[in-house]
């Protein structure tokens, strides 16, 4: 994988293009990553011991790793282009 957990990344394609966030989880077998604040979906949950009322919870869904790029890599490209 070209990104690691806790790394800051930028979404380069898709509906969340341009958004930045921290990588919360890496799923190497599926080639996907979960990024904070990106690809937020609403999940309907049944009542449980943890959440007695159940309800609708907003959570981040995984996106394909090819749709994100490390912020450090982008900064390096800008510096190379500038100087």
Curated annotation (Swiss-Prot):
Domain of life, source organism: Bacteria
Keywords: Ribonucleoprotein, Ribosomal protein, RNA-binding, rRNA-binding
GO-annotated cellular components: ribonucleoprotein complex; ribosome
Stored InterPro entries: KOW, Rib_uL2_dom2, Ribosomal_uL24, Ribosomal_uL24_KOW, Translation_prot_SH3-like_sf
Pfam families xrefs: KOW (PF00467), ribosomal_L24 (PF17136)
GO biological process: translation
PANTHER family: MITOCHONDRIAL RIBOSOMAL PROTEIN L24 (PTHR12903)
Function noted in UniProt: One of two assembly initiator proteins, it binds directly to the 5'-end of the 23S rRNA, where it nucleates assembly of the 50S subunit.
UniProt family annotation: Belongs to the universal ribosomal protein uL24 family.
Identification of the protein by name: Large ribosomal subunit protein uL24
Native species: Symbiobacterium thermophilum (strain DSM 24528 / JCM 14929 / IAM 14863 / T)
């Amino acid at each position: 994988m070209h990104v690691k957990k806790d790394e800051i990344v930028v979404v380069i394609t898709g509906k969340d293009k341009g958004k930045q966030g921290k990588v919360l989880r890496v799923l190497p077998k599926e080639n996907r990553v979960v990024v904070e604040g990106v690809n937020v979906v609403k999940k309907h949950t049944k009542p449980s011991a943890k959440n007695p009322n159940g309800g609708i919870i907003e959570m981040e869904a995984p996106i394909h790793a090819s749709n994100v790029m490390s912020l450090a890599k982008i900064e390096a490209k800008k510096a190379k282009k500038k100087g």
